């Protein structure tokens, strides 16, 4: 049987890592014994907390050339967010909950995208549809991914399906959703021991928006001001990366996971467009965005709209 590489996006978050592991288990249950989960970056503190809690080993870092290899993408589809050699791979499946952009294949494939808050929610539905066993550790990974992507069900991306899935899984995983979720999110919200470069790259994605390449990074915290006390450090890293990677715009979204608000820091020639997108005036490259927590639903569409007019 041909080996199948399963992975989420670069700079993986908890959903990207968890969904790769879950999908590998799903494929194993279909009889694909050569399916294996990989990762495209370092494990975050939040994700490591989840892996440790449910005694799951992190996926191996993908270093292989994917030319001619069978792959399954989870939690992403855009090629600039995927493995460097993805254009040479044979994409067999995609399981995702994001927009579809910069994606094409030479042949047909199984593509499942749903407007839910988390890829793991789709995978939960797939297990139920096939009558597959959901082991406690798989249930735990599903819950962790849902809580992470929905910020403990507070994000506007969160749907009833996400909540229902987590509720159905909590007894299998033997966790209290509120207590476990808050502990996991706080584990990932510590920033004082991380460099500016690490924080800017920890959860960052690139997007093609019309004629512009935009980089949007997000940092979760319990104290926005503490993070942005290091504004000059962040700006230096963001400007250097923009020059090296040819980003037209770089946006750092610092999100308060307790109060569900964010502040943004923006660099780039088109930064005034970001103020226009949110109908705010940038002050020294920064602005407060009340109620904004979701990059996918509350940041990317708004900036895309002003950059493609």
Curated annotation (Swiss-Prot):
Source organism, top-level taxon: Bacteria
Keyword check for Hydrolase: yes
Gene3D superfamilies: DHHA2 domain, inorganic pyrophosphatase (n-terminal core)
Enzyme class: hydrolase
Binding site for Mn(2+) 2: 15, 75, 97, 149
Note on cofactor: Binds 2 manganese ions per subunit.
Substrates-to-products reaction catalysed: diphosphate + H2O = 2 phosphate + H(+)
One cellular component (GO) term of this entry: cytoplasm
E.C. designation(s): 3.6.1.1
Pfam families, per database record: DHH (PF01368), DHHA2 (PF02833)
Cofactor dependency: Mn(2+)
Keyword Manganese: yes
Localization, UniProt: Cytoplasm
Record key words, sorted: Cytoplasm, Hydrolase, Manganese, Metal-binding
PANTHER family linked: BNIP - RELATED, MANGANESE-DEPENDENT INORGANIC PYROPHOSPHATASE-RELATED
Family: Belongs to the PPase class C family.
Protein name as it appears in the record: Probable manganese-dependent inorganic pyrophosphatase
Organism name: Staphylococcus epidermidis (strain ATCC 35984 / DSM 28319 / BCRC 17069 / CCUG 31568 / BM 3577 / RP62A)
Gene: ppaC
């Amino acid at each position: 049987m041909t080996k199948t590489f399963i992975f989420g996006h670069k700079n993986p978050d908890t959903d990207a890592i968890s969904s790769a592991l879950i999908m590998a288990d799903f494929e194993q249950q279909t009889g694909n014994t050569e399916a294996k989960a990989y990762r495209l970056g370092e494990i975050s503190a939040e994700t490591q907390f989840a892996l440790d809690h449910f005694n799951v080993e992190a996926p191996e870092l993908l270093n292989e050339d994917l030319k001619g290899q069978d792959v399954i993408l989870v939690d992403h589809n855009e090629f600039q967010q995927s493995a460097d050699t993805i254009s040479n791979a044979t994409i067999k499946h995609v399981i995702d909950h994001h927009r579809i952009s910069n994606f094409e294949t030479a042949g047909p494939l199984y593509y499942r995208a749903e407007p839910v808050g988390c890829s793991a929610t789709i995978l939960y539905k797939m297990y139920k549809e096939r009558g597959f066993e959901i082991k406690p550790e798989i249930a735990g990974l599903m819950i962790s991914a849902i809580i992470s992507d929905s910020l403990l069900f507070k994000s506007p991306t969160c749907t009833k399906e996400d909540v229902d899935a987590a509720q159905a899984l909590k007894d299998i995983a033997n966790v209290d959703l509120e207590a476990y979720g808050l502990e996991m999110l706080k584990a990932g919200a510590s920033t004082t021991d991380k460099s500016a470069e690490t924080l800017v790259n920890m959860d960052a994605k690139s997007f093609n928006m019309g004629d512009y390449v935009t980089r949007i990074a997000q940092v979760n915290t319990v104290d926005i001001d503490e993070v942005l006390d290091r504004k000059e450090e962040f700006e230096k890293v963001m400007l250097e990366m923009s020059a090296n990677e040819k980003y037209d715009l770089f946006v750092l979204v610092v999100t308060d996971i307790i109060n569900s608000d964010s502040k943004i820091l923006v660099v780039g020639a088109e930064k005034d467009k970001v103020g226009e997108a949110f109908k705010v005036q940038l002050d020294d490259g920064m602005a407060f965005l009340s109620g904004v927590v979701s990059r996918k639903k509350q940041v990317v569409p708004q900036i895309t709209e002003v950059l493609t007019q």
